[in-house]
Amino acid sequence: MDTPVYLYTDGACKGNPGAGGWGVLMRYGSHEKELFGGEAQTTNNRMELTAVIEGLKSLKRRCTVIICTDSQYVKNGMENWIHGWKRNGWKTAAKQPVKNDDLWKELDTLVGQHQVSWTWVKGHAGHAENERADDLANRGAAQFS
């Protein structure tokens, strides 16, 4: 069995919308890598999605990936909602356009290239890796605020 790659992801936004950042702590066995970035004008949900996208984009080959996020929006979107959105032509059950569909489509493509499972962690609750991802996201946002 492949050693899984763990992606601990988080997004941050100073104002919503406003300056935002994303952060990823990657762990593969004893190896770690930190990624972060940001945008001048964005939302917290876009940064949560971007964190996962950037983590997956950094992988160099097909992997078993465990994504640990404190975002119910991202986890529920990928595990539950996306199937209906795709069936409905990227419309919600209320027939409204899916928000952030550009990022959802990119994430859907990237997830298809790996064996991915999703884990939700409570944010700001002392989970060491999530706190590190949060710090990285805030560093990303600080570049634009």
Swiss-Prot record:
Localization annotation: Cytoplasm
Any one Gene Ontology cellular component term annotated for this protein: cytoplasm
Residue span, RNase H type-1 domain: 1-142
Keyword Cytoplasm tagged: yes
Binding site for Mg(2+) 1: D10, E48, D70
Matching Gene3D superfamilies: Ribonuclease H-like superfamily/Ribonuclease H
Enzyme class: hydrolase
Any one Gene Ontology molecular-function term assigned to this protein's record: magnesium ion binding
EC number, as in UniProt: 3.1.26.4
Entry keyword set: Cytoplasm, Endonuclease, Hydrolase, Magnesium, Metal-binding, Nuclease
One Pfam family recorded for the sequence: RNase_H
Main location: cytoplasm
NCBIfam families: PRK00203.1
Protein's job: Endonuclease that specifically degrades the RNA of RNA-DNA hybrids.
Subunit architecture: Monomer.
Family: Belongs to the RNase H family.
Protein name: Ribonuclease H
Origin organism lineage: Bacteria, Pseudomonadati, Pseudomonadota, Betaproteobacteria, Neisseriales
